[in-house]
Regions:
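Conserved N-terminal/central alpha/beta ligand/cofactor-binding core
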Residues: 193, 199-200, 205-281, 285, ...
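C-terminal motif of bacterial Sec signal peptides marking the signal peptidase cleavage site
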Residues: 4-5
Length: 613
């Protein structure tokens, strides 16, 4: 049965549950999977930047003729800031009947909203979602039931159990030598480095596009140096797929998604790709991961991945978190690691997430709907700009995992609200009259959340004192770049800032210990990316993507040694460190390639001094 579950006959009181992300024709609606741990599922979002998007539709099997009551799970996304009817309005038609209810613009949480009733014959019925505004209306699922009182659970475990009962999942099982979760730059490099050593690798990514924040979905350019002492061949592989042009919030072609995909597909003898699969569950016992379970964000297929070793390249430390790995989040107190720049008291402050955007020049004056949902812009508080990149940053005072939908939504809201003010309220707006929004990210670029703890935690003291460790590996070259709410923005939006400033602590290039790249209490878990074993301050230098790519390359090398010796990550440090050093000296990239990664290098530092052996 296609795209929707046919359950038993209506006389039983059961119905038909249709997951919106399963819709066969999505029209202009997009699949958004970023918040499944918060609200339970991927969903469809009508991200039209104020212009209604095309209809999404699918066909479902109706088990028996009769009247069906239609419920839609949706969310009024501006409700945290405004009591007004929200902007994300849409309607639904079922079996050719346009139902009267306007959905998605009332309430204050994810909930089942009643759309109306439709008389349906036995057989096939078409369901269509009609966006009315282009302002990010969202649909999680549609429930057709002969019993008007049979409303599914609102959320949580009860809703998950309901879904699994109505639409049971079949689990496909696969086995590999090495499973990498997260298809950003770190995960790409980890998987390819391992595959080039003959390791059978699975690479899982929860988006259809590879590259993470450097993809055309988020549009953050690469940063940091490659080819640095003590291992000057580390990072060569980034020259194989790294975009040739820099810049944040640029047109999609700048980010060369096809080149990234080709880089991965070239390793198909040893590397299997699983785009659009999101890890939701981990089987971990006695500090050892046996399997991870990933579900396709559109079809709902679940795959069990078994392997001796895994790498968490998710950014959020999702695999480690689900496995029970030790982790940190927020700022450590000064006493914890004796870092001179740490606050006296630790807190939950993190760097935020960016919803980047730009506008384009039109041939004639263009309009934009009035968008006013709780943010009171005026001539002093508005941002008189035609684009927004990294400084547009939200959620620094909120939990970047548990509250991320609100954080992303606030990023959308400030873009729309500010643009609305420039177009509709600002008197001297000649600069904006002939401009319209050309791109607004709905996949937010996150900088910081969980940091999984390894046998070594990189601290500010390591960096400023240039402490040399025997397992020195990839070299970080960026300054200690930390973000904080912009004081000017705080004057107008205290506690709800959406602009940031940064501080740059100058450090020399520093070779980070390998022991930062595996978990201290999950014995077969590597990590690469912004979720490695560092303090909040340490994260400030290692988090840029050329640097995370080199982390991944080292992890892939270590995974090859684990496979060869039937070893665990810690044993590479204790028993096989010389072999790892030999691999790092050689690198896993193709030799002889010109360095085409010379933009956004960052780092104001003296001449690098090679560490003494």
């Amino acid at each position: 049965m296609a795209l929707g579950a046919c359950t038993s006959a209506p006389a039983t009181g059961e119905g038909v549950l249709v997951e919106a992300e399963n819709f066969a024709a999505k029209g202009g609606w997009n699949v958004d999977q970023q918040f499944t741990f918060e609200m339970g599922s991927p969903y469809l979002i009508a991200h039209g930047m104020g212009r209604p998007v095309g209809d999404a539709s699918t066909e479902v099997t109706i088990p028996a003729a009769g009247q069906y009551h239609v419920y839609v799970r949706t969310y009024n996304w501006t409700s945290p800031w405004s009591d007004k009817s929200g902007p994300g309005a849409f309607t639904i038609s079922v079996g050719g009947s346009d139902l009267d209810a306007t959905l998605g613009c009332e309430g204050s949480q994810w909930e089942w909203q009643y759309a109306g009733a439709a008389d349906l014959p036995k057989g096939t019925a078409k369901i269509t979602l009609h966006d009315r505004t282009g302002f990010d209306g969202r649909c999680d699922a549609v429930w057709l039931t002969p019993d008007k009182n049979a409303v599914p659970p609102a959320g949580g475990e009860a809703l998950t159990e309901f879904r699994d009962k109505v639409n049971p999942r079949k689990i496909r099982k696969v086995e590999y030598d090495f499973v990498v979760v997260g298809g950003g730059v770190a995960g790409m490099c980890a998987s390819v480095a391992a595959a080039r050593q003959g390791v059978k690798v699975a690479l899982i990514n929860d988006r259809p596009i590879w590259g993470g924040c450097n993809s055309s979905e988020t549009r953050v350019h690469l940063g940091g140096h490659i080819e640095m002492e003590p291992y000057t061949n580390l990072g060569n592989m980034i020259k194989e797929f790294g975009p040739l042009r820099g810049g944040n919030a640029q047109p999609a072609e700048f980010y060369e998604d096809d080149k990234k995909r080709a880089f991965l597909e070239a390793e198909s003898d040893n590397l299997d790709l699983y785009p659009s699969y999101r890890v939701e569950k981990v089987d971990c016992r006695d500090g050892h991961i046996n399997a991870v379970y990933a579900t396709h964000i559109e079809t709902g297929e679940t795959v069990e991945f078994r392997a001796p070793i895994f790498s968490d390249c998710t950014g959020d430390g999702t695999v480690g978190y689900l496995a029970g790995a030790d982790y940190s989040m927020g700022r450590e107190s000064r006493a914890e690691y004796n870092e001179p720049s740490a606050p006296e008291q630790g807190d939950s402050l993190t760097m935020g997430a960016s919803v980047q955007w730009y506008s384009v020049e039109d041939d004639a004056p263009s309009s934009f709907p009035l968008f006013e949902y709780g943010l009171n812009f005026n001539d002093q508080s508005c941002e008189r700009v035609t684009m927004g990149e990294w400084t547009w940053e939200t959620g620094m005072n909120r939990d970047q995992c548990e509250e991320f939908e609100r954080i992303r939504d606030y990023g959308l809201m400030v873009v729309y609200s500010n643009w609305s003010y420039l177009k509709n309220r600002l008197k001297d707006n000649d600069k904006y009259r002939n401009r319209s929004l050309g791109w607004v990210a709905y996949i937010a670029g996150k900088r910081e959340s969980r940091r999984l703890l390894g046998d070594h935690v990189l601290t500010e003291n390591d960096l400023i004192n240039e402490v040399v460790y025997p397992d020195a590996s990839f070299t970080t070259t960026w300054s200690i770049d930390l973000h904080y709410p912009d004081p000017k923005n705080s004057e107008h939006f205290p506690g709800e800032e959406f602009k940031s400033i940064c501080t740059h602590g100058a450090v020399n290039p520093y070779a980070v210990p390998y022991r930062c790249l595996y978990s201290r209490n999950i014995d077969n878990l590597f990590m690469a990316g912004r979720d490695i074993s560092v303090t909040h301050i340490g994260l400030g230098t290692v988090r840029v993507m050329r640097t995370t790519g080199m982390m991944g390359e080292v992890v892939g090398m270590a995974a090859g040694l684990c496979t060869e010796h039937k070893a665990l990550p810690r044993q590479i440090y204790t028993d096989h460190l010389d072999e790892l050093k030999a691999l790092m000296s050689k690198g896993m990239g193709k030799s002889g390639l010109k360095n085409n990664q010379l933009y956004n290098l960052g780092g104001n530092w003296p001449t690098y001094r090679k560490p003494k052996n």
